[in-house]
A protein has these predicted regions:
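Helicase motor core with emphasis on the C-terminal RecA-like subdomain
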Residues: 1-156, 160-164
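Cys/His-rich short segments
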Residues: 161-178
Length: 178
């Protein structure tokens, strides 16, 4: 019931407009827009609000109270769109999500599968669109480097595995056929 597609991201404004137009076209449906960084979450959230779209946002930089309120608003259909980092979604069982958009490429197929799987849980058709650009590769490499210097996951084998997962995700995005 999930339909997947990868769209090549050409540039900031063009991608923003593509996401905005998609959300407008699906204004009566619930959806999640995943972004790789808090900065992109805030930018996309403000853009949607600027165009009158009731949206929430969710990332680690928000207070616990604000995250809970936004999550509840989305879960109980007080807002239709959630813009979030991958911090959003654990424990969310909202069955009527019709689309999941990825503004940036996730770090692995496993993350992508988990996040895309939040759509269509009611068995109805849903769409998963990943907007991909070469810039996503650099963003994800920086995030992996930061992760390895800021955590116990600096083990060389863990780093190698993370980079292998990233490379598989890149292959998926760049593949021209099924």
């Amino acid at each position: 019931n999930l339909f997947f597609r990868v769209v090549t991201r050409k540039g900031g404004k063009e991608t923003d407009n593509s996401v905005l137009n998609y959300v407008k076209k699906h204004e009566d449906e619930s959806g999640i827009i995943y972004c790789a960084t808090k900065k992109n979450v805030d930018k996309m959230y403000e853009l949607l609000r600027q165009y009158g779209i009731e949206a929430g946002h969710y990332h680690a930089g928000l207070s616990l109270e604000e995250r809970k309120k936004n999550q509840d608003d989305f879960t109980y259909d007080r807002i239709r769109v959630m813009v979030a980092t991958n911090a959003f979604g654990m424990g969310i069982d909202k069955s009527n999500v019709r689309y999941v958009l990825h503004y940036n490429m996730p770090q692995s197929i496993e993350y992508y599968y988990q996040e895309a799987g939040r759509a269509g849980r009611d068995g109805e058709e849903a769409e998963c669109v990943l907007f991909f650009s070469k810039q996503d590769i650099m963003i994800n490499k920086r995030l992996l480097e930061y992760k390895s210097t800021e955590s116990i996951e600096s083990d060389p084998q863990v780093r190698r595995n993370d980079y292998q997962k990233l490379n598989r995700m890149i292959d998926y995005c760049e593949t021209q056929q099924c």
